[in-house]
Amino acid sequence: LVPFCVEESSIVAAASNMAKRCLKNGGFKTNNDNPVMIGQIQILDVEDLSVAKEAILTAKYELMAMCNSLPSTMIRLGGGCKDIEVRQIDTMSGPMLIVHLLVDTRDAMGANAVNTMAELVSGKIEEITGGRVHLRILSNLATHRLAKVTAEFTPEELSDDGTRENGSNIIKGILEAHHFAMSDPYRATTHNKGIMNAISAIALACGQDWRAIEAGCHAWASVETGTYTSMTRWEKNDQGNLVGSIETPMAVGTVGGASKVHPVARANLSILGVKSAQELAGIMAAAGIAQNLGAMRALATSGIQAGHMKLHARNM
């Protein structure tokens, strides 16, 4: 059972329907990144950006040791600052150096730990660079913490009448709908909203920071291509089956925050039976891709309103 907290019955119905249809091909397969979050440190008024960048990288292990000197259960369990990256960006306020602390937060979402580390090392970074540290804050674009899910559907499983011909026609319609979302940001916005219908419903049910998750997922949808596009990818393989995948940031936690103290969130995590934040991330991404396919299948066949309004009427 996967708990959803959402006002639309059709969201639950669509995701459940597609989850059933992929069982014969092994269901949803997940392969998630380690739970690494990014802490950003903004450095201004640097005389020589290249020299300052090299100085930070030379002092990397000293800075990491400072981060990991904090008394923390997360660090005792093998988490902590694992690497440091430095980026140069040009802005309307002039060039800046941006330090990224890469922090393994284990089963926590990790915002408080990452922010504490960023503030802790800021003085040392000013000393090393001769610059002025300004902002020190977690990034919600968790590009090192991606949830990755794939699923495969036969034409027979997607058909209305169990025949391969009907299912193949439906797959064609689904791919045409997907290509629309890939190429048009107006369509991609609604397409991705449907994916987040499921992801955010689980996030809310399980006491997660659903606003952070939403922000990260939508930002990631434009990072790779430079334009806003579909969060999912769909294609037909050599067997004529529909193969879908999603790869998106998923900063979730099973310890700390509301997931630990809110009784409903605790109960819902217990229903899920997840043992780690990575497992929760995979389930949420799987629900997202299931919901996406359910919406596209409806749009490509009978239209979205018939099933939606029928379930909507039951709620009234």
Whereabouts are the PLM-identified features?
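Glycine-rich anion/phosphate-binding loop at the beta-strand->alpha-helix junction
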Residues: 107-109, 114-264
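Electropositive phosphate-/nucleotide-binding environments in soluble metabolic enzymes
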Residues: 9, 53, 57, 61, ...
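Small-residue-rich
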Residues: 1-94, 99-102
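Glycine-rich phosphate/diphosphate-binding loops and the adjacent beta-loop-alpha structural elements
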Residues: 181-203, 288-291, 295-316
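Short, ordered loop/turn segments at secondary-structure junctions
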Residues: 7, 138-141, 301
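A structural-propensity feature for long, helix-poor, extended segments
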Residues: 25-57, 163-166, 221-293
